[in-house]
Regions:
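Active-site beta-loop-alpha junctions enriched in small/polar residues
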Residues: 64, 91, 113-119, 184-186, ...
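Substrate-binding cleft of extracellular glycoside hydrolase catalytic domains
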Residues: 107-164
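Catalytic domains of cell-wall/extracellular-matrix polysaccharide-remodeling enzymes
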Residues: 154-230, 241-248
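N-terminal pre-catalytic segment of deacetylase/amide-hydrolase enzymes
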Residues: 3-58, 69
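Active-site beta->alpha N-cap acidic-glycine motif
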Residues: 44-121
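Acidic (Asp/Glu)-rich catalytic clusters
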Residues: 49, 74-80, 96-109, 126-139, ...
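Second-shell loop/turn segments in exported
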Residues: 59-61, 83-86, 149-158, 184-188
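C-terminal active-site subregion of NodB/CE4 polysaccharide deacetylases
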Residues: 43-59, 66, 129-130, 134, ...
Length: 257
């Protein structure tokens, strides 16, 4: 029989390998078992007036603002309706393009891609706020940490809240018609206190909050799901390791689900 110590080592190794910043054993087990199922919540389809068996597809483009090429491709896809919605990283150098595009296309579904990590090798950024106001979120180069574990380990909750609110405020001040928030790399979905803060920010700003079904393990009798938290029954994203030439096949292969 597997020992408790060995089980803990296996669990810790699993989360470390997958860069999942979960340090509470009970919560870790919930994530592993995926103990919260879509049946626990009224489906998004039902909320929109469809039957629970109807399948709705949302094709979402995040990381707007990352690079001019990302912007131009995403803008074209949004205008052609091949992409349903998109969200903007407000800590990058190309957000003016997004603001201009939003002004010309005010009915588009655009959100703020709340960002607290900087994982790219050639694209690095810090926060919207001054470095002195968010020291716990920054490395020695005054940039966000490159992975979610370090962010979760070192971040101060007040500084996180202030930075995320500043990102929303900046988007609104630039004329972006913000409809929702989501989380870059899912960094805000693991720590219970940070996750609650994420949902509270959505409520405070009268925005919808994207929640993948995996993150709904946080909800229980002491923390019921708020109405503005929109749970997606299934969530698919091409992960690292999938070659560019294989992207089309990846998405076509999930189309039958």
């Amino acid at each position: 029989m597997i020992s408790v110590t060995l089980l803990c080592v296996v669990i810790i190794s699993y989360f470390h390998y997958n860069q999942l910043p979960i340090y509470d054993l009970d919560l870790a087990l919930k994530f592993i078992k995926n103990s919260t199922q879509k049946e626990d919540f009224k489906s998004l389809a039902e909320k929109l007036g469809y039957s629970e068996d109807d399948k709705l597809l949302v094709i979402h483009a995040d990381d707007l603002g990352l690079e001019k090429s990302v912007n131009s491709t995403s803008f074209e896809s949004l205008k052609k309706n091949s992409v349903s919605s998109a969200s903007v990283i407000m800590t990058t150098n190309n957000i003016d393009e997004v603001a201009n595009f939003s002004e010309l296309n005010p009915t588009l579904d655009l959100g703020v891609h709340l960002t607290v990590t900087s994982e790219w090798k050639i694209h690095k950024w810090g926060g919207v706020l001054d470095d002195k106001d968010i020291p716990s979120l920054l490395n020695d180069n005054n940039q966000f940490y490159w992975n979610k574990r370090k962010f979760t380990k070192f971040s101060n909750l007040v500084e996180v809240r202030n930075e995320l609110q500043a990102q929303i405020d900046l988007a609104v001040s630039m004329g972006i018609n913000v409809s929702h928030i989501d989380s870059h790399e899912g960094a805000l979905f693991f720590d219970p206190d940070i996750f609650k803060m994420y949902l509270n920010l959505a409520k405070k700003n009268d925005l919808l909050a994207f929640v993948p079904i995996q993150a709904s393990v946080h909800f229980d009798e002491n923390f019921p799901k708020p109405d503005h938290a929109i749970i997606f029954d299934q969530f698919f994203m091409a992960e690292a390791g999938i070659k560019p030439d294989d992207m089309e096949k990846y998405y076509l292969d999930i189309s039958w689900i």
